[in-house]
Curated annotation (Swiss-Prot):
UniProt-recorded name of the protein: Protein 3.8
InterPro entries xref list: His-Me_finger_sf, HNH_nuc
SUPFAM superfamilies: His-Me finger endonucleases
């Protein structure tokens, strides 16, 4: 039987250290979000408190996305563009053959539902 186990210390990430040095401890249930989405930019004016759901709204577009815009997809069956925005557990959808109409709807709906955490790419 082993007498001791290796113990690893994981230091807080730098953006957390920067936030706590200026603002004190992070409230329970909150994350520190990078406003510009760049995890290397730890300037205090680029950091903000975010709930987990708000942090997920601000995620980058997945690499598997072929349309280039979050929430935009092409339906082969209906031959229409589809816009999808999710907030508070509810999925909001809009379909149209006009691409610009769907893109405008996505931008407008994200701004309305996600506020300052809206991210489009």
């Amino acid at each position: 039987m082993r007498k001791s186990y290796k113990q690893f210390y994981k230091a807080p990430r730098r953006h957390i250290q920067v936030w706590e040095a200026a603002n004190g401890p992070i409230p329970k249930g909150y994350y520190i979000d990078h406003i510009d989405g760049n995890p290397l930019n730890d300037a205090l004016d680029n950091l903000r408190l975010a709930l987990p759901k708000e942090n997920s709204w601000n995620m980058k577009t997945p690499k598997s996305n072929t349309s280039g815009l979050k929430g935009l997809s092409w339906s082969k069956e209906r031959e229409m563009w589809r816009g999808t925005v999710t907030a508070e557990g509810k999925q909001h959808n809009f379909r149209s053959r006009d691409l610009l109409e769907v893109v405008a709807w996505i931008y407008r709906t994200r701004r309305e539902l996600h506020g300052q955490f809206a991210r489009f790419r």
